[in-house]
Amino acid sequence: MTSTSNLIEQVIEAWQNMQAKTPLVQCITNSVAANYTANVLLASGASPAMIDNPYEAESFTKISSALSINLGTPTSEQMQAMQISAKTAQLNNIPWVLDPVGYGPILAWRSQMTDELLQFKPSVIRGNASEISTLAGNQVQSKGVDSTLSSDQAYQQAYALLAHADCIAISGESDYILSNEIDAVIQVNGGSPLQPKITATGCALGALIAAYSAVATPTIAALSAHVHFAIAGKLAANQAQTMGSFSSIFMDYIHMLDDNLIEQYADIKLLNIQA
């Protein structure tokens, strides 16, 4: 039977495995997030590679430990690379994470491309509440790429997406993880209200899920990444109250996380059991 203590043990194991294996993560991400995402992965113990050229996509995906696809600022060439890499990952049993940034009717082209990527069965779909709810077929008004829906509202609408992925991760004031692996919703608490005010934190979180998916199941990967960010955000907020200092200290704690901090600060709950 799944328990919070058992899940925390698995998060610690996933973190230890990532430090030992330094997984190579191919990131096809947006122009705003690329640098920050790479730094988060390096600080976490993974090895990022920002390969988004369609002529190199297949060969590089084949040697990668995991793949992260983020639709934040898609170009036609990037879209080609995404389709090639997602298909290659599926054919070679390489875990991959889909972050449907800005999904919805206002940004119709990228949304159509997101729908097409679902055929390649991502290991994890990660997004904010509005993105996940809209992707699941609900009509939600977003504010650009930012969410206008709370994460606790969205997780109840997201079950349909488990037909397309092993795990759904919804970020917000609290984070929620739905999975085909366990019959409960996992709630992750912690973090800081300053996190969403730093550009690319959500995008980097998706890439961190991909890094963890190289060493753990999709559910534990999503949980580990969210716990990693939640602890770093909580501890950084204890020391900094302004955005500049918070951003720097947050990255420090992304790097300084260890088993003791996970055991001490991981705040997770198991919610309603799926019918």
Curated annotation (Swiss-Prot):
Q: Which UniProt keywords apply?
A: ATP-binding, Kinase, Magnesium, Metal-binding, Nucleotide-binding, Thiamine biosynthesis, Transferase
Q: Name a GO molecular-function annotation.
A: hydroxyethylthiazole kinase activity
Q: Which InterPro entries match?
A: Hyethyz_kinase, Ribokinase-like
The catalysed reaction is: 5-(2-hydroxyethyl)-4-methylthiazole + ATP = 4-methyl-5-(2-phosphooxyethyl)-thiazole + ADP + H(+)
Annotated positions binding substrate: M50, A200
Tell me the residue numbers annotated for binding ATP.
R126, S171
Query: What superkingdom does the record give?
Result: Bacteria
The pathway where this protein functions is: Cofactor biosynthesis; thiamine diphosphate biosynthesis; 4-methyl-5-(2-phosphoethyl)-thiazole from 5-(2-hydroxyethyl)-4-methylthiazole: step 1/1
Please list the cofactors this protein needs. Answer: Mg(2+)
Known EC number? 2.7.1.50
Q: Does the keyword Glycoprotein apply?
A: no
Biological process annotations from GO: thiamine biosynthetic process; thiamine diphosphate biosynthetic process
**What family does this chain come from, according to its entry?**
Belongs to the Thz kinase family.
**What role does this protein play?**
Catalyzes the phosphorylation of the hydroxyl group of 4-methyl-5-beta-hydroxyethylthiazole (THZ).
NCBIfam families hit by this protein:
PRK09355.1
What is this protein's name? Hydroxyethylthiazole kinase
The organism encoding this protein is Acinetobacter baumannii (strain ACICU)
The record lists the lineage as: Bacteria, Pseudomonadati, Pseudomonadota, Gammaproteobacteria, Moraxellales
Protein encoded by which gene: thiM
